[in-house]
Amino acid sequence: MAFRSRREKLRSILSGPGCIHPGSVYDAISIRIAEDLGFPLGMFGGSVASLAVLGDPDITLITLTELAEQMRRMSRASALPVLVDADHGYGNALNVRRTVQELETAGAAGLTIEDTLLPAAFGEAKTQLISLEEGVGKMKAALSGRSDPTLVIMGRTGAAAITSLDDTIRRAQAYEATGVDALFFTGIKSRAELEAVAAATHLPIVLGGAPEELNAPDYLAGQRVRIALQGHAPIAAATQAVHDTLKALREGAPPKALKGLASAELTSRVMREAETKARGADVLGFKK
């Protein structure tokens, strides 16, 4: 299948001995830059998807169609494997199945399904979780939705920050029993908590939003953490750069005086200009 090699690369990361940091990607430009810099994996987060596609905060306003289409654009632009934050699967367990099908055909190497109650319930300001039973149903639905067995399905829980460590372990063990390929934890606050969930489970671990004391790669690898997220700085940097450039122009700065712009060489490389010209020479008679 067209995307199988990307999925096998993600599986090799999960089965390997080390812990890697993925590059946060959100469009064709960012994924090509991450690929060129040698990142082994891209992470397409829900928050950056909402910001890049809609300009909205991370409150589950983006639709599955919009998420999958953005993933499809990135898959076309780059061969970098991408792990997609599929949030709650955009509905109930049947919706989760559809979500997996759409993201699989869009070229995702893997995806996460979480047990957060989304969108937020009426009258509830605090983040809530769905029941363990509903979470298990979503994991089973996700697994039944894939047609390519190499597509990586991860069960994600934020219970560590919402309920308790004991609940985190119960949920992780239940999701593991469904046959998912890895466990994704957010809200882990200490080494003791990480060691507890690692001791109680067997699957590869993905860690998001961890404190500074959990950022030692060798230590993480020893706890079966194979992927550790580092946030989404690239889109924040891009937002600031666009703001500063437009502000300078609005205030009268001449375009040639602007600083921090991409060079012609970098722009050409990111847009794959040489490859496009070569294809044009072959099929349109362009001069090389």
Curated annotation (Swiss-Prot):
User: Cofactor note from UniProt?
Assistant: Binds 1 Mg(2+) ion per subunit.
Sites binding Mg(2+) sit at D85
What InterPro entries does this protein map onto? ICL/PEPM, Oxaloacetate_deCOase_bac, Pyrv/PenolPyrv_kinase-like_dom, Pyrv_kinase-like_dom_sf
Q: Which UniProt keywords apply?
A: Decarboxylase, Lyase, Magnesium, Metal-binding
Alphabetized GO MF terms: magnesium ion binding; methylisocitrate lyase activity; oxaloacetate decarboxylase activity
Question: Disulfide pairs?
Answer: none
Give the EC number(s) under which this enzyme is classified.
4.1.1.112
Kindly list the cofactors needed.
Mg(2+)
- Domain of life per record: Bacteria
Q: Which GO terms describe its biological process?
A: oxaloacetate metabolic process; propionate catabolic process, 2-methylcitrate cycle; pyruvate biosynthetic process
Catalysed reaction per UniProt? oxaloacetate + H(+) = pyruvate + CO2
Q: What enzyme class is recorded for this protein?
A: lyase
Tell me if Lyase is a UniProt keyword of this record. Answer: yes
Q: Where does substrate bind?
A: S47, R156, H232
As for what it does, the entry says: Catalyzes the decarboxylation of oxaloacetate into pyruvate. Seems to play a role in maintaining cellular concentrations of bicarbonate and pyruvate.
Q: Which family does it belong to?
A: Belongs to the isocitrate lyase/PEP mutase superfamily. Oxaloacetate decarboxylase family.
Concerning PANTHER family, the annotation shows: OXALOACETATE DECARBOXYLASE, PHOSPHOENOLPYRUVATE CARBOXYLASE
Complexes and interactors: Homotetramer; dimer of dimers.
- Protein name in UniProt: Oxaloacetate decarboxylase
